UniProtKB/Swiss-Prot annotation:
Start-end of Low complexity biased regions: 626-642
Organism of this sequence: Aspergillus fumigatus (strain ATCC MYA-4609 / CBS 101355 / FGSC A1100 / Af293) (Neosartorya fumigata)
UniProt biased composition (Polar residues): 651-660
Biological classification of the source: Eukaryota, Fungi, Dikarya, Ascomycota, Pezizomycotina
Protein name per its UniProtKB record: C6 finger domain transcription factor nosA
Induction line: Expression is repressed by laeA.
Gene: nosA
One cellular-component annotation, GO: nucleus
Length: 685
């Protein structure tokens, strides 16, 4: 064997002996040439644990728990924890961390950590190798609530912890932002963090803004991409917004429509989601879809043209041509993708956009030809089943939310089924989620608690069974009683109503807002449920009290163009349809409609108010109201006013001679029948 090979082999053997015995000889140390190092326990990440990333703190990444997580008594996780998927659990986590930080500061200020014995005990308690409290595990046994949408609230750990011993560490921080896999920004910095300097206990401790753990907006919005600092996303949002807008391929003729959609339509589509997430995450997703999804793009351009026509007063053949041209292009791309059986997720997004965007901004008397929303939804429900979205999230985990497309589908399915008096497409899924306490994300999207929405689905099923004659009156009353008790379980412990605006900052508080909106939906669901009882009368005291309760709750929900009345279309419809002529609710609704201005005539709100006015006209004074079926068909076909003609009898002789007319009796005209008679295919959500 050559000499060089023997030397290399001996050096390798010496290195192995060093690793096995941990006591190398001097000769072996010379052959290795490097000092001994402790073995690495785990692979370091690029940005630290989840808690340190959100706090924008330096993470030492010790194993199994970093120093910051050990001090704060939280479980050190590098992936998104399950409590992050629920706003209430995020708020509880935030309060616990803030209290722990305040407690630690008070201990430092009072000199509680100066005792060597106490210091050593606390250091042992907060060792990285010691177990940490898991916020995801309940601290005490609680009674299981069948109708609760959240897991039992974890108990608060009362163990006292002191800071680590002084140390010094160099931390290199790298931050990089990607859009469509293209790096837009890269920041790198190296900083030294030292705790060797003892604080002067006689001086007041400074205020550390970052010790608030998470700013409010981080608890109100969850980033879609793990490992991306939300602060960077918010700071660079304006630049990213402009970049994405410029990348959308449109012609010069359609560029004004795109700009109008982005700056005027996009911000009014999801007002509740805007309050919860400040709209940035959803707006970026929509802009990216506009860039890559042709069908989605043409749908949005058509909606923008409709909004321009109704708000800016554009009239003429050109604007109608733009609307129909983009409608045709959207349907053409949709049919092409369906025939090729590709891009199912993009097809689903575009189909849901065709349904929801149009019902958000379209006029009440749109005379241009279009495909009814329920035909679009039939295709969307088939795509949802093909993609397996109803079972995408395992049952029993209330913290993991389903995809956004499934949440939007659930919203349309539950409330849209009441428009047609049929069972929701995914009623079994909602029933299973209700029993397991799983969330569908409806509360953050449209403002109503998921449990109430699940019960509305059950009420709709009962309505469909009654309409089809599959159950008798006794069974209807039994189901109404059972569902009424379940609605009571969804009521909060504290039923006090308060305004959603913060008294100190004036900012909207999404938790209070959704609580008030859920109250309106819950009362409307009870009115809808009671209306199924045989012999129901809108003038009975119980119904009058429920309608008055809705009118009172509306005082705690912001109104006007920047309010949330357009998110309450369904409960306003149900309450108004069963309100008495002298009800205060009608005056409140008229006032809030006037505050909306031009927006009161647009979208679902305008259609809802138009339908209510027609229902009131037919039911409030039925003694001299007559309905002619022939006049309805001719009236609805006209582009002017599809409202059926109401004739007033001038003499008793006219009553006897009108053989083709039939008198509309009180409480015999349902709001759903009025829609069908006039050919109004409304989706009032």
């Amino acid at each position: 064997m050559p000499v060089a090979s023997r030397k290399k082999s001996s050096a390798s053997n010496a290195a192995k002996r060093v690793d096995s015995t941990q006591s190398p000889s001097p000769g072996e140390e010379v052959s290795i040439g490097t000092p001994e190092k402790a073995p690495k326990l785990h692979k370091r990440s690029r940005s630290g644990c989840f808690t340190c990333r959100l706090r924008r703190k330096k993470c030492d990444e010790k194993h199994p728990a970093c120093g910051a997580c050990s001090n704060l008594c939280v479980k050190c996780e590098y992936k998104r924890p399950i409590w992050w998927g629920n706003a209430e659990q995020r708020r509880i986590q935030k309060e616990r961390i803030k209290n722990k930080i305040k407690q630690t500061k008070m201990n430092e200020r009072n000199g509680s950590a100066t005792d060597p014995l106490a210091r050593s005990r606390n250091m042992a308690a907060t060792s990285p190798l010691s177990p940490v409290f898991d916020f995801n595990r309940p601290g005490h046994t609680e009674t299981y609530d069948l109708f609760s949408s959240h897991l039992p609230t974890p108990g608060l750990n009362q163990t006292m912890y002191a800071p680590y011993a002084p140390y010094e560490i160099d931390v290199k921080t790298e931050r990089q932002t990607f859009i469509n896999d293209v790096p837009l920004r890269h920041d790198s910095s190296i900083s030294t963090f030292s705790t060797f300097t003892a604080p002067q206990l006689s001086a007041p401790l400074p205020t550390f803004p970052s010790e608030d753990w998470l700013q409010d907006e981080y608890f109100s919005q969850a980033p879609n991409l793990s490992g991306i600092d939300p602060a960077i996303c918010e700071q660079s949002f304006g630049q990213t917004y402009t970049t994405l807008q410029s990348n959308i391929p449109v012609s010069d003729h359609d560029r004004p429509l795109l700009d109008h959609f982005i700056h005027n339509v996009l911000r009014i589509i999801f007002p509740v989601l805007e309050a919860h997430q400040r709209g940035h995450t959803r707006a970026q997703a929509i802009l990216q879809a506009l860039e890559t999804n042709k069908c989605y793009l043409h749908c949005c351009l058509s909606v923008a043209a409709i909004h321009l026509k109704t708000t800016e007063g554009f009239v003429g053949e050109q604007i109608d041509h733009d609307i129909m041209r983009h409608r045709f292009e959207a349907v053409s791309h949709l049919c092409q993708a369906l025939s090729e059986d590709i891009n199912h997720e993009e097809i689903l997004d575009a189909t849901l956009a065709m349904i929801f965007f149009h019902c958000s901004v379209g006029p009440a008397d749109d005379y241009l030809p279009d495909i009814p929303w329920f035909d679009h939804f039939q295709a969307a429900s088939n795509l949802v089943n093909r993609l397996g979205l109803p079972t995408a999230v395992p049952e029993g985990n209330p913290y993991v939310l389903p995809p956004f497309s499934m949440t939007l589908t659930s919203w349309i399915d539950i409330l849209g089924s009441t428009m047609q008096g049929r069972t929701p497409q995914f009623a079994h899924t909602y029933r299973a989620k209700h029993l397991s306490g799983s969330s569908s994300g409806l509360r953050e999207l449209m403002g109503c608690d998921d449990r109430v929405m699940y019960l509305i689905s059950e009420i709709t099923c009962l309505d469909a069974l009654k309409t089809e004659g599959r159950i008798d009156a006794m069974a209807v009353c039994s189901h109404v009683s059972a569902l009424g008790r379940q609605l009571e379980f969804t009521e909060p412990v504290d039923q006090t109503l308060e305004h959603p605006f913060s008294p100190t900052t004036g900012a909207i508080r999404p938790e209070i807002l959704t609580k008030n909106m859920t109250t309106v939906f819950r009362i409307a669901a009870r009115i809808y449920l009671c209306s199924l009882v045989p012999g129901f009368d809108r003038n009975q005291p119980s119904n009058l009290n429920l309608v008055a309760a809705v009118a009172n709750t509306l005082n705690y929900i912001p109104s006007g163009p920047n309010g949330f009345d357009r998110s309450l279309v369904w409960p306003l419809l149900i309450t108004g349809a069963f309100s008495a002529p002298t009800s205060q609710f009608r005056a409140v609704l008229a006032e809030r409609a006037s505050l909306l201005g031009d927006h009161a005539d647009l979208g679902s709100f305008g259609r809802m108010y138009r339908l209510l006015q027609e229902v009131w006209r037919l039911t409030d004074d039925p003694a001299d109201s007559y309905y002619t079926p022939e006049e309805t068909s001719s009236s609805s076909a006209s582009s002017g006013s599809p409202v059926p003609k109401i004739e007033r009898s001038a003499s008793p002789e006219s009553n006897s001679t009108g053989s083709s007319m039939r008198e509309i009796k009180k409480q015999q005209v349902h709001w759903r029948d009025v829609m069908q008679r006039n050919g109004w295919h409304y989706l009032l959500i």
